[in-house]
Structure formats: structure tokens, C-alpha cells
Amino acid sequence: KLFGTVANKKLVILGFAFKANTNDTRESAAITICKNLLNEGANLIIHDPKVTASQIEKDLNINPAISLENESSSFDEKPKSWEHIKSISNLEVFNNAYAILILTEWEEFRRLDWKEIAKRMIPPAWVFDSRSIVNTEEIYDSGLRLWRIGDGLVD
């Protein structure tokens, strides 16, 4: 449903730790999900408030020489496979993204400005909420499509 492929698509990953309020990535579902998306050719922007870029590289078995830790404020250029960002307060991170995947239930992800984010994304833009933390009404009012574990496509 995501244009038939994720190859060369910008996807924003929100959360990498196995649960909120920790930097522990052991057995995190995000590892498998991100590996599979990278293997399919997706371009990932990864944000977790506590997990470092070096930990993500280790978990994904990525050579640091080919990864990029983005500390700049320009998110319009395509990432090189993946980028780690320390903050999502600058909503430019969502520019030209096809989907957002919420993989950890951080409190800050509950308070995102979905209407503003939706304006920056490429339609039909998706939110994949693996933690059931977003407000369904806010997502639909913003024009985004929502998929949840256990619910599938939420209409």
C-alpha cells in the first residue's frame, strides 16, 4: 500500500529502544524492522531520545563509515540509508517522508503536531503506530492514514 515498495522512500522511525524511558535496545522490535526496511532499500530517519547513533549502528550491524549522524538542520536531502537525529522539534525532519513508524511509546510522540507534519509529507502519508499511542481523530483530521498492530488499517 506504500506505493508498492519502500525502496528509495524516506521513512521516519520514532523510537528504537525496546520501551520508553530507557536506552536499552536488547530485543527491540525496531532492530528487525529497521534491518528489513534497509534491506528493501528504504531511507530511514531514526530518532530515539536516549539511543545513540553508535548503538543503532551496532544493533543494525552497519559500518560507521557508510552511515551518517545528522546534526544539521537541513532534512530535505535524501539520507544515505539512514540518519540518526537527536531531536524532532524541528519538523523539517518530516519533509518529503512517506511514512512515520512509531516503534517506542515515548511521551513526546503523543504530543506531535500531526496537522503540521502531514503538510510536510508525501501523500498518501502513513502513520504506523506499533504502540497504539496516537489519537486516531487527530491523525485522520490531519489527512494521514493510520495502521496499528492488532487493528490494521484504522478507518
For the regions a language model picked out, list residue spans one by one.
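Structural/interface elements that position substrates and couple domains in central-metabolism enzymes
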Residues: K1-D155
